A protein has these predicted regions:
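Short, solvent-exposed segments of well-ordered alpha helices
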Residues: 5-8, 12, 52-63
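An amphipathic alpha-helical interaction surface
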Residues: 55-152
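Membrane-proximal alpha-helical anchors
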Residues: 1-46
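Short, charged, low-complexity loops and linkers
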Residues: 45-53
Length: 152
């Protein structure tokens, strides 16, 4: 019965995290990271804004995504949600790579603890990917047949 309660709590925690990812501000931040950030980070004025205090998160929406992953990493590190449940359906390392220059800047300004929970989450994700390089699909489960991929 205790295991059943624990599994229910794990599921509730994961559902809350997944719900957070669909909040408008978070979605906007991830859209910014995907579409605008790669060009914005090349602009000297945009990079300079990271050196001032406070940083405008309406302009630097990447900070919202970084805080999301920082919070999520803390939940995983403190066992509020099981890493396996989260890592089976997410790849935070893709965003870490894009955000590494910003994280390095924040650590230079504020110390090595800045975004350490985000880093923890990414290390766990990299370990997960090394453990399951072809995915985590059950070995004895049949696979569905897909049509040929779309071509140009």
């Amino acid at each position: 019965q205790l295991r059943h309660l624990r599994n229910g709590n794990d599921l509730q925690g994961l559902l809350k995290v997944l719900e957070m990812a669909y909040q408008p501000a978070i979605q906007d931040a991830f859209d910014f990271l995907t579409h605008s950030f790669p060009n914005k980070i090349k602009e000297p004025a945009f990079r300079h804004e990271l050196l001032v205090h406070p940083i405008d998160s309406h302009v630097h929406k990447e900070l919202i995504a970084m805080e999301y992953y920082e919070r999520l990493g803390s939940y995983v590190k403190n066992h509020l949600i099981p890493a396996e449940l989260y890592l089976d359906c997410s790849s935070p390392q893709l965003y870490w790579d894009a955000l590494a220059p910003v994280i390095a800047t924040m650590r230079h300004k504020h110390g090595p603890a800045s975004y350490e929970n985000f880093e923890y989450l990414v290390v766990r994700a990299l370990d997960w990917d090394a453990r399951f390089p072809s995915g985590n699909y059950p070995k004895n489960m049949r696979r569905l047949v897909l049509p040929p991929p779309i071509s140009e």
